[in-house]
Amino acid sequence: TNKDPDNFIRTTMLINTLNFAFTDFDTSIKYSIERDGQKLSDSEAMFTQVNEAIDSGIDLLNGEVLEKLTIEELEKIFEGNIKMPMLKERVEILNLVGAKLVDSYEGDWLNFIKNGPRKLYANGEGLIERLVLEFPRFDDSSIYLDKEVNFYKLAQLAFWGIHGELAHSDYFRIEDME
């Protein structure tokens, strides 16, 4: 949908915010949609529907929209073979992410990214360090044997995706990625 690098970054951050739990826990049925005779499931279905919503004029890349998004609006975006699993949690996460973007970054993921060094780790100021601190959705750490273990998979995937797509153009390159 977005050839524009700024919107690619915004979309990637949005997708990574929503990228979890696509199977109904009770029935084990995967969330899926059909487009052009093809069945799309899991994150592929979600990605397609996010882009369709954006193309239809729903500005999911804007923190102000995310902050006020309702479960009814998200249900309309994610119409599939079953109700999107964990829809209530997704709305809560999007509302929190939107509120943080509005409060601290004028509603825009780009301002979050521009607010620090282009490094994943930089004495607490790196992209991953700030993302997991400021956006709890991305903080996938646990306690194991009385020690904190940090995975940061979602945060890493977000920035790997952006870096992989845009590093060749020098538009967005993370200094400590390789």
List the model feature ranges, each with a label:
Residues T1-E178:
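HhH-family (HhH-GPD) DNA N-glycosylase catalytic core used in base-excision repair
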